[in-house]
Amino acid sequence: MLFKALIRPAMFRTSANDPEIAHHWLMNRMATLSHSQTALKIIEAANAYKSPALERDIFGVHFPNPVGLAGGFDKNGIALPALAALGFGFIEAGTVTRYAQPGNARPRIFRLSVDNALINRMGFPNDGADAIHERLARLKKPAIPIGWSIGKSKVTPQEEAIEDYLYSLRKLYDFSDFFTVNVSSPNTPGLRKLQDKEPLDQLLQAIVQESEALAQRTDSPTAKAVLVKIAPDLTEDQLDDVIEVCLQRNIRGIIATNTTLARTGLRQTSSESGGLSGRPLHTRSLEVIRYLSQHLDNKIPIIGVGVSSGPMTPGEP
């Protein structure tokens, strides 16, 4: 109540010209709380809700509940313990790239308050796989599943993309319960071309094979699951290609969806480039999820992203 009444409005006022200020303010405080066991216990006691009815066992991972925090919130893994204490069933951290990169120039997040939406063109700002590996080696892993989203560095040529992904996979393998292959951000030039059938097939084949090889080297009984995150702007033919590749390459889950380049239905006009998320994407995300569900026939789990801002209505997946 205090957060909604006082803290949130103050954060919005002070970050009106650059919403990223509010995000960094919150992340820094969550990072501080992550180093206090007392604070973590208090946060968990106030937020955690446990019920056997909510538990799920999917691709060899036990989830205490099916509601997770999507990638992009904690890009560098600085606040995972505090975020886990909020009651999430899992956290997807990242996206991480092989090389540290600042992302695109600020401001790069824009609020569309009338539409309950955001436009972002972040461009995968992160500390890089090496630095994040060192950080995670020093921190205690939260009790809930942690997945890491991996993407292509901006400086890496398209023809070297596979090795770029594999480098991050190797660096983060010991600290992750599953991996998300991000090929759908609209803010890295050429990244979405990796969703095309042939490059997607080559990329996912290499990542799954490397995950299996790493499992053997570490005497792990099973390889870490590999998931893929797709764009909402794909046509049905493109979705069919994604489904075919995922089934062929033993992809363990499809995350639907990332942000959209479309601006359909907006009441608040904006000329800013980037990916749109929030309420205007709700319908399209559900359309993609339904299409995947109808054509996958329960062969691969589907993780919906950004389609819930509260209790879902009857009939929603």
Predicted regions and their residues:
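Glycine/Thr-rich beta-alpha phosphate-binding loop at enzyme active sites
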Residues: S34, T38-Y49, P186-P199, E244-N298
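A gly/proline- and charged-residue-enriched helix-loop-helix capping module
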Residues: G94-I144
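Short beta-strand/loop segments at the ligand-binding rim of alpha/beta enzyme cores
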Residues: G60-G68, P142-S149, A213-L234, Q294-V305
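Conserved, mostly hydrophobic/aromatic
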Residues: D18, L69, I91, I132, ...
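Catalytic cores of alpha/beta
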Residues: N76-A85, L234-Q248, S293-Q294, N298, ...
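Active-site-adjacent beta->alpha loops and helix N-cap segments on the catalytic face
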Residues: Y99-R108, A129-D130, N187-T222, T235-D237, ...
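An N-cap/entry alpha-helix motif that binds or orients negatively charged groups
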Residues: L2-R56, N120-P125, A129
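Active-site glycine- and acidic-residue-rich loops that bind
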Residues: S153-L166, K193, P199, L227-Q248
